[in-house]
Amino acid sequence: EEVRRTLMSQYGEEKLYSGGLSVRTTLDPRLQQIGRQALIDGLVDFDRKKGWRGPVSRIDTAGDWGVALGGIETPSDMAPWRLGVVLEAQKTKAVVGLKPSRLQNGSLATEREAVEVAYDEIKWARSSSKKDNKSVGDILAVGDVIYVAPKDPANLSGAWMLMQIPEVGGGLVAMDPNTGRVLAVVGGFSFAMSQFDRAIQARRQPGSSFKPLVYA
């Protein structure tokens, strides 16, 4: 996105999209993917320590909960996270119905999927002021709309976790210290949620800007 913005300012929209430009960068796709995941993991871990802020929304599960979930907008770049609704809140697990995918014609898929989230993957959301939160039902309730994600994205039939979109933002820049080439740039948690690039557009504190030079 930063490359697009730079080219737009230098050449204009017409030359950018129809001028036949060939652009090469030093970005490494593998490191870019690793960097994005590292930033997301760090933001999520930090945000969890601040506590659970509650469900995204609440819906009635008596009817077709898939239709109700389908009406809730979600960022397009959240995969493998999925929006879901709590169908059962048992002592040791929650049964979560996942938001149906949309077909090419825009209609919702008729198939309804559900996954189980064990208490061990939910207990981080316990309130520190309530020592008796020892079951899923003490944290979640039927009808709660939440985010869940597979513990292993390559194994969707495995364990799933309760997730929460972090309020804190962040950015990441990875460079080769020998050549100065930029290998990865991550501007935030979700580009769909915010196009502000915290790695490029944010103004860092002078002390923080000087640290890479000191530690190098």
Stretch-by-stretch model annotation:
Residues 1, 10-204, 208-213:
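Periplasmic/cell-envelope proteins involved in peptidoglycan metabolism and beta-lactam response
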